[in-house]
Amino acid sequence: MHGGKDNYTYLTTAPIRRVIPTMAVPTIVGMLVTSLYVIADTFFVGQLDTQSTAAVGVVFPLMFFMQAFGFFFGHGSGNYISRELGARRHGNARRMAADGFFLSLFTGLTLMTLGLVFLHPLALLLGSTPTILPLTESYLSVSLLGMPFLMSSLTLNNQLRLQGNAAYAMVGIVTGAVLNVALDPFFIFLLDLKVQGAALATVIGQVVSFLLLFRMSHHEGNIGIYWRDFAPSWPAVKEIFYGGSPSMSRQGLLCVSTMLLNHAAGTWGDAAIAGMSIVGRITMLVMAVVIGLGQGFQPLCGFCYGAKLYSRLKRAWWFTTIVGTVFLLVVSGLGWLFSSELIALFRDDMEVVAVGVVALRWQLLTLPLCATMMSSNMLTQTCRKPWRANLLAASRNGLFFIPSILVLPCWLGLTGVEVCQSVSDLLAFIVTVPVMVYTFRELRA
């Protein structure tokens, strides 16, 4: 970790092969442990029955919805902060930190209230079937209570990370996630709260993360959050939109696509929903490493863009992309060999495993392409190329996935549901390549 005064020199001059791992490792750890919020719920609830597993899977899109807003405010304010620190304009960075945090907190409180008021229609919208509706509502009602804490935690996390203080960001998120995993068996089995206990453990972890991150934002070398700095203006909101809308597109469309996936899989019963939701969690865990690597690249990208060090920025992008691709190739090979065991680890049900194995193997075929897509999206987002960043963010889970999930099951049945993500990944990669060629031509040293 480097103090605020040292971050500029470190991010703009130190060797790339040292800077990115230094920034990425805490972020990867944070991303992996954050994934345990939902992985742990799936694992422990999976010990109950298939219906409980499906109910938790149905609420899964809500996590993406909350992340969409948290990343919108976090990346929107954080990317601006990193550019302003790179340009040595610290006052602007301080005001943006307060604007991003408080707007995120107030938005979370508003959405939580709306969700609780419209609980029943929300459960149906998420894709619940009549057989699991009571379980879905039970899990959902508690999960909504954590919305303002998760959203504002993600905002703080990304602000700290994009200042170059990834270790602080990691500690706050990891502590809450570890607490969640520890509390899951206590609430689910010992107190016999079942799916509601899983949600309660998650909310407690989110509250703890929020408190720690807020406290750490006031440590020396970080930009503290103060009410006196909160003065949102149209230029500030516009900067948040430019920097955060790609994250909103990416996570928001992931929410929509997962709901459509639940509805499509529901045609073949609760086992199909459970199988597809388990595959979603496995790939989410793998992608957490690649996203963490990309987020380790972002502070360097933002500082170098602000300092006009474009050649260094491009070299860092290539380093990030190559490392991410190699990692995904290795993981995809191992996942293909042990696909049955991976699915059965979460729910040892023959129907669930049958659906999950086929879907997982299809996704693993195109997973290595995701490293290029992710690093490209983060570069265009951090370098204030909002329309290109939004196009890349929307491609994988929206532009191509949504038509695929609406059309392919009609032609191929359940197989159409299982292959949708692979088709979308391939088409999104084809779009990414020319966008990056054009962007690199603009970034001339």
Question: Model-derived features: where do they sit?
Answer:
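Short alpha-helical transmembrane segments in multi-pass integral membrane proteins
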Residues: 1-24, 81-148, 190-245, 301-366, ...
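Short runs within selected transmembrane alpha-helices of multi-pass transporters and secretion channels
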Residues: 74, 143-161, 169-177, 198-211, ...
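Helix-terminus/linker motif at the lipid-water interface of multi-pass membrane proteins
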Residues: 32, 36-54, 123-130, 186-193, ...
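N-terminal transmembrane alpha-helices
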Residues: 11-43, 47-48, 64-76, 80, ...
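Hydrophobic transmembrane alpha-helices of multi-pass small-molecule transporters
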Residues: 65-68, 112, 180-185, 209-214, ...
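Residue-level hotspots within pore-lining transmembrane alpha-helices
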Residues: 33, 37, 66, 70, ...
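Transmembrane helical elements of multi-pass membrane transporters/channels
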Residues: 22-41, 142, 153, 176, ...
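Small-residue-rich hydrophobic transmembrane alpha-helices
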Residues: 53-113, 150-169, 275-339, 370-389
